[in-house]
Each structure stands twice: as structure tokens, then as C-alpha cells.
Amino acid sequence: SKYRYLLWIKKILRKMSKIRNAITKIHNEWRCYCERKKLKYTDFSIISNNCWGGLIYQKFGLQYTSPTVGLFILDEDYLKFVEQLDFYLAQPLKFIDPRMSKHHDYLYREHNKEITYPVARLGDIEIFFMHYHSKEEAEIKWKYRTMRLNRHRLLIKFSQRQSNTTDVLDRFAAIPLRNKLCFTPLLYESSQCNFVYIEALKQLNIQGGDETPFTLEAVDICEVINNLEEE
């Protein structure tokens, strides 16, 4: 009958979907394996002001060994965070109503709506857990990923997204950590840090969007990781 025929078709389509998903998974795992083979070691950690760090872990198929995954911290707060990294990582997260954020007006203009994801204060800075469903999830993952952090092989990455002056770049360059990488829409040089000019950030900082493809075109991330100095 027509009904049985339709059921048969649906069954075939479900099987095809499972096969396609399995092939995609195998392909992704193989791609990650090939990328990992380019690395000298895989026990590095990335502190990042946005989702970039998490995407690098995903590129290599590695476990997250940093709390700064799936979230963002605005420029000024991020500089405070990395200037006193040990201090802030020892502070408890205190979740707040997003409408009480000191950055509420800025974020409302950016999103054109109220934000609904978890927001927490860490001392006097604020962290926006953009890719988390609840405060509980955000807090649990923040804690155990902080415990995984490898402080001896640490990449401190900063993308200049909200600020547009060299003052923040001066501050970032002065942070007494060995492995610093900064993507900026400004022309800036320093012997204390690897500053990478990304013209696309000028537009991204106005319209929003993912910086990752542009940054990975500008730097060889395998080379960056392979040349990390031990802290």
C-alpha cells in the first residue's frame, strides 16, 4: 500500500542519514588527526577573549584545557584578567541578571535585544557565557577547565574587538607573559608580543562576525603552538 511504501522510504532515509553522519564523523576525526600530527605537543592551553580558543581546540580535536571556551570578555576587562591571571582565576564566579551588567547598554546595541545567556562577575570583571545553557553548566565547566590549565605552556591570545586605540595594545604588550598573540585592525609593532594586523577586523568590529577564518589565514597556528616557550 501507499502507506507502507512511505514508511519504507522513511526507514531508508533514516538509515542514509545515520550513514552520512557516521561518514562525516570519521572524516572530521581523520582531519583532526592529520592536524594534530603537525604539532610537537598537545598539552598547551589557550587563554582567549572570545570563542577563538575553543575553535583551535576543535581544529585539532583536543580536550579543552582552558576555562575561556564558549564565552567572551570585553577588551578592557580581558586586559585586567590577563594582567592578573592567577588572581582572577582564584575568584569565584558570581552570576548576575544580564540587565545588571555594566556593559548592558553596549551589548543591547550590539544584539538589538536583551541577552539571555549567563553572565557572571569574576572580581570586578564580567564574563559572558554565550554558548552555555545555564549558570550551572557555565560554573561547572569553568571550574574543571581551570583545573586543566597548563600554566607552563600557555598562549595568551587577544583580538582587539571593542577598542580602537593603541593604548590597549601597549597594555597587552607589557603583560609579563612569554607567549602573547594579538590580532588588531591597527598597525602596531612591538618586540614584546606578536601583533598581527587583520584588516577584516575593521568591518567585523562594526557588523560583528567570526574572526577565526581571517586569523588562521594570517598566521600558521601550528607554528605558533610549536614555538610556545615554557613559562
Locations of regions flagged by a protein language model:
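Short, surface-exposed, polar/charged, turn-prone segments marking secondary-structure boundaries
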Residues: I73-L79, C182-L187, G208-E211
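Membrane-proximal basic amphipathic "stem/tether" segments
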Residues: S1-Y41
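Polybasic, proline/glycine-rich intrinsically disordered low-complexity segments
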Residues: L186-E231
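Extended, basic/helix-rich recognition subdomains
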Residues: R145-F195
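Exposed alpha-helical structural elements
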Residues: W8, K18, D77-K80, Y144, ...
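Positively charged, amphipathic N-terminal segments that serve as targeting/anchoring signals
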Residues: Y33-E35, L39-T42, S48-L154, F158, ...
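Surface-exposed polar/charged interaction patches
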Residues: L6, I12-K15, E29, Y88, ...
